[in-house]
Amino acid sequence: MLEIGLTGGIGSGKTRVADMFAARGAAIIDTDLLAHEITAPGGQAIPALVEAFGPQCLRPDGAMDRDAMRAVVFADPAAKARLEGITHPLIRELTTSRAAEIAHAGEHPYLIYVVPLLVESGAWLNRVGRVLVVDCSEDTQIARVMSRNGFSREQVLAIMAKQATRAQRLAVAHDVIDNDGPVEALTAQVDQLDRTYRALSAAGVTQA
């Protein structure tokens, strides 16, 4: 099965594009959703998080307090490394098991992994057969995140500064979706890539 890594900067529209591919029959594994799963109440990462950061890292319902942890790791690279050392192996384990289940079921023409930090992680570039980048201008990113999350412009810029640059993402892309235009243009691009991915997967092509 052809496996594609979908990535893009914050506010680029990764989730929307992934949903459009899912509607066309693609299998989707979203690593952000897996991260939420393991840090939900009773999640696999919770005991290790409490041991590393104390009970103050949890919300009253027992889930990881994402806002509190975001503030901690933003200011402390060592804390960021500790958090990733807990969550990343669990996410990789879940990703591998879900992918095996999808391949075994044989119900989807191809598999898309949604990985916000695909370029930054490095390992993902060796795992997937193709890289699909959802791209838009930085001004569009900023406007979308300010509207969606209620962040200030400075907060959005600080997040973007921690991510790969637009040029770095585009440099590793096999395919690019321009998400600066109207929904009709986005739909046409998804339709074209869906046809391409189906054809490649049917032909047994797993690498770009």
Curated annotation (Swiss-Prot):
Pathway: Cofactor biosynthesis; coenzyme A biosynthesis; CoA from (R)-pantothenate: step 5/5
Keywords associated with the record: ATP-binding, Coenzyme A biosynthesis, Cytoplasm, Kinase, Nucleotide-binding, Transferase
CDD domains: DPCK
Primary localisation category: cytoplasm
Binding annotation for ATP: 11-16
Cell compartments where the protein resides: Cytoplasm
Pfam families documented for this protein: CoaE
EC number: 2.7.1.24
GO MF annotations, alphabetized: ATP binding; dephospho-CoA kinase activity
InterPro entries given in the database record: Depp_CoAkinase, P-loop_NTPase
Record has ATP-binding as a keyword: yes
Catalytic reaction(s) noted: 3'-dephospho-CoA + ATP = ADP + CoA + H(+)
GO terms for biological process, alphabetical: coenzyme A biosynthetic process
SUPFAM superfamilies per the UniProt record, alphabetical: P-loop containing nucleoside triphosphate hydrolases (SSF52540)
One GO location term (cellular component): cytoplasm
Enzyme class, spelled out: transferase
Domain DPCK intervals: 3-208
Family to which this protein belongs: Belongs to the CoaE family.
Function: Catalyzes the phosphorylation of the 3'-hydroxyl group of dephosphocoenzyme A to form coenzyme A.
Protein name (record): Dephospho-CoA kinase
The species this protein was found in: Cupriavidus pinatubonensis (strain JMP 134 / LMG 1197) (Cupriavidus necator (strain JMP 134))
Species lineage: Bacteria, Pseudomonadati, Pseudomonadota, Betaproteobacteria, Burkholderiales
